[in-house]
Amino acid sequence: MPQTKHPLPDTQLLTPGTLSRLTARSPSAHKGQFGHLLLIGGDRGFGGAALLCAESALRSGAGMVSLATRREHVPAALARVPEVMALGTDSANQLMGLLEQASVIVAGPGLGQAAWGRSLLSAAANAPRPQVWDADALNLLAKGGLSLPSGSVITPHPGEAARLLGISTAQVQADRPAAVRALSKKYTVVAVLKGAGSLIASPDGRLSRCDRGHPAMATAGLGDVLAGLVGALLAQGLPAFDSACLAVWLHAVAGEHQGKLGRGLAASDLIPAIRQLLEEQSPCLK
């Protein structure tokens, strides 16, 4: 697995004491105060990625979660997470109302790189909202012609990072700090370079490292859960860099807790663990 375990200059290690916290909620709080997250993803055959991301966002505290996906995935979404507002979406025109309502957009889980995914992502890119791009949104970004609004986050693994930078995966791995900084500078976003020893870089030069996690986390769907978590923290008012750092730490520590059972960890196992850790770190009530 990718490694960033050795000491790095000018890098802050993520610990409970260095992480930002969500503010406690007023007894009179309502859902509109905690953001409306729109998730765009789930092309044919990849609905599970979108559902994992949507459930993660909901369970991490977003006030409302909408899902724009292929219409054949809507029944599964309603059955698994009825609290998520799932809309069968055939074209970018159907996104326009949702884009206006959303406060945060997450794009990429199960999106695919065919015409459907490209058109939806192009529409999202034009919305002046903080965004989280993962998976195929990053592969489409690497092809050019798209940019992200300010206050956004990208979450590539080393292969995606290599495509975004136009270099080899080996070159990314040879100097991960330089790679994540280059990503942040090139796209003017907060960049998360995933892997053992995940790194988070911001355009203003900050760099943080997470040394938590477990090898049982080497399984599909973990990135979808992370993307939903980052989006939920953004929706609740944390700045992009703080959201990314807190999300990476919560995700890794949840993986440690669930990884104690060994092989067979499923991405969905992390969601209740993340919820518990978030409550311990940022209590809902004072």
Where do the PLM segments sit?
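Small-residue (G/A/S/T)-rich helix-start motifs and N-terminal tracts that mark the onset
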Residues: 1-132, 139-153, 158, 162-286
